Amino acid sequence: MADAGDNQQEAERRSDETESRSIKEPKEKEDEDENPQDQIQSKERMRQSSPYPVRPGKKDCQFYLKNGLCRYRSSCRFNHPTQRPQELPVRICKHIMDRNVAEPMYQDWRESESERRFDERTQRTFGDERTQRRYGIEYSGARPEKRSKIVPDFQMRDPRHHDTEWRFERERMERIERQRREAEENLQEQRQRDSIERQRREAEENLQEQRQRDSIERQRREAQENLQQQRQRDSIERQRREAQENLQQQRLQDMPENHNVDDQQNLQEQRRISIEKERTEARLRLEQIRPTVSFPINEFIRAVVLLRELIENWDDKAWKK
């Protein structure tokens, strides 16, 4: 009995396989016999049976044109064309070949595009409820308080949108990093320029100070030389006058005793006049040296003391004679 049951099951299995093979072979033959035009028409019929509605005369759905998906599917009130354009028509700027013009324009466009995408993401995030409410009012055919709630189909995340966001975020970070590097380079250049300018000013100040010191030192040496020369001239003049006075005194001593007293008085008067004259000349010479020569105060005091001692010595010698 068991063998009979097994044989019956095996026969049924073989008959099923034969039947399925006979069904598949005509289908394959039919597919092979179909021409490419029939295949295109069949695909067109399948595309027309898509959940995205085709609404002639309406504005095309931008989300569908961009991503090939629409979150509202059959409830969307925009048109969903059966054939999406592969490339959108874009006008080429005439300045695109000029690098100096094209790069700033591209930067501005990229920033505006980033802001636009951010606004779209914000609108999608915060405007879904209002949009669903508007769609429900238009297609429910009822009042707002009695309209049916429309829940959108499952939202598939487009990987291209994620890649676009990641690319814009990377470009933004690169732009920030580039701006930071440029700011650091500008700061370093400014510091270098400030350092060079400071060194130049310090060099000029040092040069001016050195020139002033050299000028003061030169004036001091000239004053010392002038003072020494004046001392030498005064010494020679004093020796000459002393020699003349000694000669006159010797002559007076050699004169006979019968000379009258008037001659001696005249001689003393002449000596007094000569002493006063020498004193006046020494005072004038001192006044001339004082404003013209710039030398330390110690040297000036020493010169005054020497002149005073010289005048006093002349007075003593004159009165002794």
From Swiss-Prot:
A zinc finger (C3H1-type) spans 55-83. Keywords: Coiled coil, DNA-binding, Metal-binding, Zinc, Zinc-finger. Residues 1-59, 181-269 are annotated as: Disordered. Residues 164-290 form a coiled coil. It comes from Arabidopsis thaliana (Mouse-ear cress). InterPro entries: Plant_ZF_CCCH, Znf_CCCH, Znf_CCCH_sf. It comes from the Eukaryota. PROSITE patterns: ZF_C3H1. This is Putative zinc finger CCCH domain-containing protein 9. Pfam families: zf-CCCH. GO terms for molecular function: DNA binding; mRNA binding; zinc ion binding. Residues 10-29, 181-224, 231-244 have a biased composition (Basic and acidic residues).
